[in-house]
């Protein structure tokens, strides 16, 4: 049965330092054998695909994970494990949970790199691979640009303020309305407090573990 909103699930995954939980969002008929897995970029989360997933859900079961360290997923105790090998292992666990022999894969940026790595494995479940904003080579200017905001403490009083920050970082990805920028920002936030001149201020901070920046910084 198709639903206007996704269903949230979790799967337990293993790493060299123990177990962690990965969240994933499911759209469409859970019994549909035709599965599309949509995986987000470095600092994003699975709700980025809401519009695409909603459109596809009449024909496919659509799965949008929050890669570990992001969204509703757990955080890793060792930040050095935030990398493609961990993410690929988690996706193998996810596909096993879905109990399907094959999947179509849509990957944006980091999600595309995960898809490339998984598609290269013998016996891969990926039958079709769609890459967005990524290729086999990372451009030289990418890492310095990302480190300008990734893992940097941030606090916004309102959704509108946060959406402006999202626009400043991502405006090169094409034209969007104000409402679209807010939709792309809403699930990027978690409630937070910050000290102000008259006491605590309520607002929002990024959803992800700041330590996801550690391996990126080490690559420079």
Language-model features, listed with the residues they occupy:
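Serine-hydrolase catalytic-loop signature spanning alpha/beta hydrolases and amidase-signature enzymes
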Residues: 41-51, 62
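Alpha/beta-hydrolase active-site loop signature
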Residues: 43, 67-71, 136
